[in-house]
Amino acid sequence: MQNTCTLNKKNSYSYDDLLASGRGELFGKEGPQLPAPTMLMMDRIVEMNEETGTFGKGYIEAELDIKPELPFFGCHFIGDPVMPGCLGLDAMWQLVGFYLGWIGGKGKGRALGVGEVKFTGQILPTAKKVVYRIHMKRVINRKLVMGMADGEVEVDGRVIYTATDLKVGLFQDTSAF
């Protein structure tokens, strides 16, 4: 798949770049978009490429700086604040969709599933940094563009979530989805 947005194809992206993606400015109005804050689950993408990763088909690494004032800590749970695990899973889906746009895919991104997710730790407001790592396994470029990847979430140097077979599709029309 050829990237038609070569001007925007970099190996790392700042927070401002990620916000531009949410406005449809990074990969164009027909490319996938990241969500806006407060659902944007990363502050930067520190590495992206098409050649490495566990399967040699692409790798993405992104980071989220943890601050006690992040909105989810105030409500999940009162007196026992913890980042919802589903937000870490969503961050991995967000990154697979971003990758599809980065390689030139067009359409609106939708999570399609995950093979298996394991949670072996938690993200507390006392943590400093979350690192997301995505290892692309496959990209299908037909009527539906779909990416499949494995991923992990690390907090302060310890892997706490793993996911296999993360699937994201890019749809030209989401009305029947």
From Swiss-Prot:
<dbReference type="GO" id="GO:0034017">
    <property type="term" value="F:trans-2-decenoyl-acyl-carrier-protein isomerase activity"/>
</dbReference>
<protein>
    <recommendedName>
        <fullName>3-hydroxydecanoyl-[acyl-carrier-protein] dehydratase</fullName>
        <ecNumber>4.2.1.59</ecNumber>
        <ecNumber>5.3.3.14</ecNumber>
    </recommendedName>
</protein>
<keyword id="KW-0443">Lipid metabolism</keyword>
<dbReference type="InterPro" id="IPR029069">
    <property type="entry name" value="HotDog_dom_sf"/>
</dbReference>
<keyword id="KW-0444">Lipid biosynthesis</keyword>
<comment type="similarity">
    <text>Belongs to the thioester dehydratase family. FabA subfamily.</text>
</comment>
<dbReference type="InterPro" id="IPR010083">
    <property type="entry name" value="FabA"/>
</dbReference>
<keyword id="KW-0275">Fatty acid biosynthesis</keyword>
<keyword id="KW-0963">Cytoplasm</keyword>
<keyword id="KW-0413">Isomerase</keyword>
<dbReference type="InterPro" id="IPR013114">
    <property type="entry name" value="FabA_FabZ"/>
</dbReference>
<keyword id="KW-0276">Fatty acid metabolism</keyword>
<dbReference type="GO" id="GO:0006636">
    <property type="term" value="P:unsaturated fatty acid biosynthetic process"/>
</dbReference>
<feature type="active site">
    <location>
        <position position="76"/>
    </location>
</feature>
<comment type="pathway">
    <text>Lipid metabolism; fatty acid biosynthesis.</text>
</comment>
<dbReference type="Pfam" id="PF07977">
    <property type="entry name" value="FabA"/>
</dbReference>
<comment type="subunit">
    <text>Homodimer.</text>
</comment>
<dbReference type="GO" id="GO:0005737">
    <property type="term" value="C:cytoplasm"/>
</dbReference>
<dbReference type="GO" id="GO:0019171">
    <property type="term" value="F:(3R)-hydroxyacyl-[acyl-carrier-protein] dehydratase activity"/>
</dbReference>
<keyword id="KW-0456">Lyase</keyword>
<comment type="function">
    <text>Necessary for the introduction of cis unsaturation into fatty acids. Catalyzes the dehydration of (3R)-3-hydroxydecanoyl-ACP to E-(2)-decenoyl-ACP and then its isomerization to Z-(3)-decenoyl-ACP. Can catalyze the dehydratase reaction for beta-hydroxyacyl-ACPs with saturated chain lengths up to 16:0, being most active on intermediate chain length.</text>
</comment>
